[in-house]
């Protein structure tokens, strides 16, 4: 399951989505997330599905690789669906003892499941097609107006970049520790929830130690190179909007207009 997490990983490919400016992809991801919450009917989610499918095809990232990330939220998805079905009041369609499944609960469960899945896939496409350095530069440029309010934009962007960069590293470290623990007789799969939580303790302690050690090594390396942020720092590859970025913004605005129209019309 650890290997199935795709957020934070980068998949190299020669695609239109990979070539887009990181600012375009950041704004596009935010716009897609907003649209997921604007749509509230299955007709609306059909439009979101078409848009998302188009992005996946244009990204040239294997569908299997993208959907692999859904395995990590499968249990959360089941819990969300279950509690929405039995806790939402409305017309009862099925009953077993004190457990009642309502029609409204089924609709809400389906809606929440779709939203959760689309949020994960949408975020995964952005990180799979954008390197951490590109994300840092794009985020810093987008937040640059906040410099006038004395907000440390560069530091915020750098922290997010380091966090994204550490995700695959920590996942790899976790996988190594799990294999070492399993070789010593540890069992992470069997048992109830409490037993599984207890079995995770030998995994978490060395993982935290490794994370702090890596963070300390990175901090010392940055200090040794006299690293400092600021407005005077230059970029090896300055960000510039191109024609494909303008086309992407037009498509995004049209898509959001459809989402707002669906919401206003109650479709």
Locate predicted features.
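Alpha-helical transmembrane segments and their helix-start/interface "positive-inside/aromatic belt" motifs
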Residues: 25, 64-74, 248
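Membrane-helix interfacial "entry" motifs
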Residues: 14, 37, 60-68, 96, ...
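Transmembrane alpha-helix interface motif
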Residues: 1-42, 48-57, 141-144, 148-151, ...
